[in-house]
């Protein structure tokens, strides 16, 4: 007869996030001792870590915060959405974020080495992965600073934690519009801030492609440059934040909205889980 109850199974599942059968086996092996069962689950998980290294951890969530002048975001990945929406995984991700903020880490190596509990973020990540039973990883860390840093987190699926995160950095005058612009960035996915931000090689490639298309259409060679420049404007409107039609009022560009507010966007970052 088992030396544990359904309540014991439920409590250990809530503590570890492990499956019901794994918890029952551990409690049976531990003769009902919850502490021993917890250690059994942890050790079995650690032994299987190497087997999971080749798996893809492309699900997960974003945890982020801003104090108004500094924004920090971490992407924590799991193999499945089932784990991503687990409250223990969410809590763990928020602890990773707290470690990132406290340590001032600005890159992945620094974050993994940052103090967390009695060890490092890497130590806690491996231990938690052993209990959860999936490959877990820290996908990235983003740290931005500026006069005004606004944050928007978006759930692409109402059943899952945030999958898209945006930081928008503005001058002081931009506080009134920064959050709406962050929401715009989440939806419209601009690649660049403005025309000057487009790398020369990207622009050269786009111009060459447009020239080829225009010539193949049989346009007179003497007007091809003018047509190409017109088509480049369409490229800018699709890819540059300040040139895009504003989500809340498509009759105006984001640049016009900023001008009306007397504001300037100096930087933005858009992150999507797994991308």
Regions found by a protein language model. Give the residues of each.
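N-terminal assembly/interaction segments in proteins that build large macromolecular machines
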Residues: 2-275
């Amino acid at each position: 007869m088992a030396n544990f109850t359904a309540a014991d199974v439920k409590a250990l599942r809530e503590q570890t996030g492990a499956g019901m059968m794994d918890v029952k086996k551990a409690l049976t092996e531990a003769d009902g001792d919850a502490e021993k069962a917890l250690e059994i689950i942890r050790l079995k998980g650690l032994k299987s870590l190497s087997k999971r290294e080749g798996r893809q951890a492309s699900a997960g969530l974003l945890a982020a915060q801003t104090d108004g002048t500094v924004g920090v975001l971490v992407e924590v990945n799991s193999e499945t959405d089932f784990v991503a929406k687990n409250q223990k995984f969410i809590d763990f991700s928020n602890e990773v974020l707290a470690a990132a903020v406290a340590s001032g880490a600005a890159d992945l190596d620094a974050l993994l080495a940052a103090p967390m509990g009695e060890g490092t973020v890497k130590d806690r990540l491996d231990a938690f992965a052993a209990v959860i039973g999936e490959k877990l990883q820290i996908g990235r860390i983003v740290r931005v600073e500026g006069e005004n840093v606004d944050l928007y987190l978006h759930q692409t699926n109402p059943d899952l934690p945030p999958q898209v995160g945006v930081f928008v950095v503005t001058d002081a005058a931009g506080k009134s519009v920064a959050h709406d612009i962050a929401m715009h960035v989440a939806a419209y996915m601009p690649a660049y801030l403005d025309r000057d931000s487009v790398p020369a090689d990207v622009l050269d490639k786009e111009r060459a492609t447009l020239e080829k298309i225009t010539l193949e259409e049989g346009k007179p060679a003497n007007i091809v440059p003018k047509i190409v420049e017109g088509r480049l404007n369409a490229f800018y409107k699709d890819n540059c934040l300040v040139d895009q039609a504003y989500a809340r009022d498509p009759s105006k560009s984001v640049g016009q909205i900023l001008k009306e507010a007397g504001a300037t966007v100096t930087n933005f970052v858009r992150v999507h889980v797994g991308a």
